[in-house]
């Protein structure tokens, strides 16, 4: 907004359906005319009377222009706020004329005698960034990556580590038991190669004299009967 602009707010009815056009650069612009008619109450006749109508052309640019073309139509009562501009032009006959137009900042329906269903349209510059590859999309991808990474590292890794610990501890313990068993076998081997234990009392060889006391070969080969 430049210094010295004449700000204006107009309430009126749309005379004709808005026209949507596009500039060579691709910018959308919508034009429509409104009639703002003052009304006053005549106490003598006890009726409302219409004054002289003010006709103004309204120009709307970019995304708002597309929304206006899709939402508004002839006869609707609207509220327009913007800057009052004077535009001069020359007719085909060479006559110079001037018109007053409103460069609209905001356009909306008047809800005094009507209802409106407002639907928000996604903004082209931010919708792709937010949902496609911007903040929301990137944040969502990052969260999924963290969740998957954390799940893989924590659960899978921890589960594998536990299995590894169980296998090592169990196998190691089992191996230790085997080693202990082998140690017992060694003891048995020692038992086999060590001094003989005492024979039972009912052993027939128990009453034989010790070896080397006499008999054939210096030892008793047969028990006495």
UniProtKB/Swiss-Prot annotation:
Keyword Cytoplasm included in the entry's annotation: no
Keyword DNA-binding annotated: yes
Comp. bias regions, Low complexity: 164-188
GO CC terms: nucleoid
GO biological process, one term: DNA replication
Pfam families: SSB
Domain of life of the organism encoding this protein: Bacteria
A GO term, aspect molecular function: single-stranded DNA binding
Keywords: DNA-binding
Region (Disordered): 111-225
Ranges for domain SSB: 3-111
Biased composition (Gly residues): 125-148
Quaternary context: Homotetramer.
PANTHER family: SINGLE-STRANDED DNA-BINDING PROTEIN
Protein name listed in UniProt: Single-stranded DNA-binding protein
């Amino acid at each position: 907004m430049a210094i010295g602009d004449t700000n204006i707010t107009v309430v009126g009815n749309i005379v004709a359906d808005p026209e949507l056009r596009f500039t060579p650069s691709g910018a959308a612009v919508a034009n429509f005319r409104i009639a703002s008619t003052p009304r006053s109450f005549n106490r003598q006749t006890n009726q409302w009377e219409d004054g002289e109508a003010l006709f103004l052309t309204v120009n709307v640019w970019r995304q708002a222009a597309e929304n206006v073309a899709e939402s508004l139509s002839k006869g609707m009562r609207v509220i327009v706020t913007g800057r009052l501009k004077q535009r001069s032009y020359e007719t085909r006959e060479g006559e110079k004329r001037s018109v007053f137009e409103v460069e609209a900042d905001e356009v909306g329906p008047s809800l005094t005698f009507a209802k409106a269903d407002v639907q928000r349209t996604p903004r082209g510059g931010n919708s792709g960034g937010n949902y496609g590859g911007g903040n929301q999309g990137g944040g969502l991808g990052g969260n999924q990556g963290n969740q998957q990474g954390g799940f893989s590292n924590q659960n899978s890794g921890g589960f594998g580590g536990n299995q590894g610990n169980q296998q090592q501890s169990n196998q190691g313990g089992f191996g230790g038991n085997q080693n202990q068993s082998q140690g017992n076998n060694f003891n048995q081997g020692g038992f086999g190669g060590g001094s003989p234990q005492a024979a039972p009392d009912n052993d027939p060889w128990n009453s034989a004299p010790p070896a080397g006391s006499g008999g054939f070969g210096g030892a008793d080969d047969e028990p006495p009967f």
